From Swiss-Prot:
The keyword Membrane applies. The keyword 4Fe-4S does not apply. It comes from Magnetococcus marinus (strain ATCC BAA-1437 / JCM 17883 / MC-1). The gene is nuoN. Its EC number is 7.1.1.-. This is NADH-quinone oxidoreductase subunit N. Its main location: membrane. It catalyses: a quinone + NADH + 5 H(+)(in) = a quinol + NAD(+) + 4 H(+)(out). Keywords: Cell inner membrane, Cell membrane, Membrane, NAD, Quinone, Translocase, Transmembrane, Transmembrane helix, Transport, Ubiquinone.
Length: 483
């Protein structure tokens, strides 16, 4: 019997090829390029590779062929949009962390190589047309982040964060793999298109495939830190170096949400009646945990961990809705979340490089000494709380409107209530900056690139809250390519 080779078009994988070649080349170069100057050279090349990959991705939008390797690798408009978000959620935290990494003696070459490998795994997750590619992408991303979380080798909290993330992440990967095996056992395929075709036929028993789907969703929920699969997030966010926390707070979530879109919409679209309520339940639990558990936090990184759990819950509402309006709301929310996250962590890193800034009380009187920094932090906190007219309000409004349009009134009402509760801990940060008396001079410098990135993030958070038209239009075209 002749073996039929799948169609192979490596041009569709050019961004992945660029990143993988550069990452492996820099891994070898780091053995020779030692010291601070070598690390600077490696980080510049890594940042350059990210920008090259972004340009290639943008130039490839609208290509006639959208898949290769027999449909296992997909490069459609949705993939391009999510990859651009992935590049931004990698490049921006990397750049704002440069000074922090140098002062903390963490910025050697391997750090940036691991960052590239983690992002490469995310790129494969976004372009997956098969559970095989999806799982390989998840493992590549996860293994790199396990090491990054424990990168501060002399710090017990960092070591604990890396080990805890590794142990729980390994368990989540096992659950995901078992779910994939159940799905394969029923459908006879791991390709999303084949699974979708199978589900459109009339079958008497769906128990096996339903159990498999629940396990797959559970595994992916761990990656986005959705409750009740969130137990790792607060400890890992707090213990990992702040530069790593800034990176892992957004980048893995972008990749995992893209994977959820691929699995739920492309493979299991006909089963929305089954997975829709599961997503709604995860959304409500995540919003509740994020809002209530964050109230008693005094560590700002731990607070932002619970904040991110809550934000994941709001985004999951859009997935639960299961139509174009809901999916568009998810992408709008994720895009805005990237810039809120980069801005907030960029300001935390300014203080961290001077040896403080982990505790909320470290921000006492910041407005009196550095009014510009305090204003930017207030913008990001107000936006995360969903206060108009900022982008965070517009993002939550889109989510709640989609839920109401789908008659998910209970979920929408709970979302509004939990959003109001979570506003208390965002306001606690603002109150500390503006109404408490300063205990230090806050005379730390801020490099030009960090100022530019945090400043532009603040401008976008304000601008998209008032004029969201361009973002909404881009997202609408992206979702049309997925439906």
């Amino acid at each position: 019997m002749a073996i039929q080779m799948p169609d192979i078009n490596l041009a569709l994988m050019l961004p992945e090829i660029v990143i993988s070649v550069v990452a492996m080349g820099l891994l070898l170069a780091s053995a020779w390029w030692e010291g601070a100057e070598g690390a600077r050279r490696i980080r510049r090349i890594a940042a350059g590779a990210l920008m090259v990959a972004m340009v290639i991705t943008l130039l490839g939008v609208g290509a006639t062929q959208s898949s290769t390797f027999g449909g296992m690798f997909v490069n459609d408009r949705f993939a391009a949009f999510m990859k651009v978000m992935l590049y931004l959620s990698t490049l921006l935290p990397m750049v704002v962390s440069w000074v922090y990494l140098e002062k903390s003696k963490l910025g050697n070459g391997e750090y940036f190589v691991l960052t590239l490998f983690a992002m490469l795994g995310g790129m494969f997750m976004i372009s997956s047309g098969s559970f095989l590619v999806l799982y390989l992408g998840i493992e590549l991303l996860s293994l790199a982040i396990y090491v990054l979380a424990a990168y501060k080798r002399d710090d017990l909290a960092s070591n604990e964060a890396g080990l805890k993330y590794f142990v729980l992440g390994s368990m989540a990967s096992g659950i995901l793999l078992y779910g994939i095996s159940l799905i394969y056992g029923v459908t006879g395929s791991v390709d999303f298109a084949t699974i979708n075709a199978y589900l459109q036929q009339d079958h008497h028993s769906m128990l096996g495939i339903t159990m498999g789907l629940i396990l797959v969703v559970s595994g992916l929920s761990f990656k986005i830190a959705a409750a009740p699969f969130h137990m790792w997030a607060p400890d890992v966010y707090e213990g990992a170096p702040t530069s790593v926390t800034a990176f892992m707070a957004a980048m893995p979530k972008i990749a995992a949400f893209a994977a959820l879109f691929r699995v739920l919409v492309e493979a299991f679209g006909p089963m929305h009646a089954t997975w829709g309520p599961i997503m709604a339940l995860l959304a409500v639990v995540s919003m509740g945990v994020g809002a209530l558990a964050g109230l008693g936090q005094s560590n700002i990184k731990r607070l932002l961990a619970y904040s991110s759990i809550g934000h994941v819950g709001y985004a999951l509402i859009g997935l639960a809705v299961g139509n174009q309006m809901g999916y568009e709301a998810v992408l709008v929310y994720l895009t805005i979340y990237i810039f809120m996250n980069v801005g907030a962590f960029g300001l935390i890193l300014v203080l961290n490089k001077e040896g403080f800034g982990d505790q909320i009380e470290d921000y006492k009187g910041l407005s009196a000494k550095r009014p510009g920094l305090a204003l930017l932090m207030a913008i990001f906190m107000f936006s995360m709380a969903g206060i108009p007219p900022l982008a965070g309000f517009m993002a939550k409004l889109q989510i709640f409107m989609a839920a109401i349009d789908a008659h998910m009134y209970t979920v929408a009402i709970l979302g509004v209530l939990f959003s109001a509760v979570s506003a208390f801990y965002y306001l606690k940060v603002i109150k500390t900056m503006y109404f408490d008396e300063a205990e230090r001079a806050f005379d730390m410098p801020m490099d030009f690139l960090s100022r530019a990135i945090v400043g532009v993030s603040g401008i976008l958070v304000v601008l998209w809250g008032i004029l969201p038209g361009s973002l909404m239009a881009s997202v609408a075209e992206t979702i049309k390519s997925l439906m």
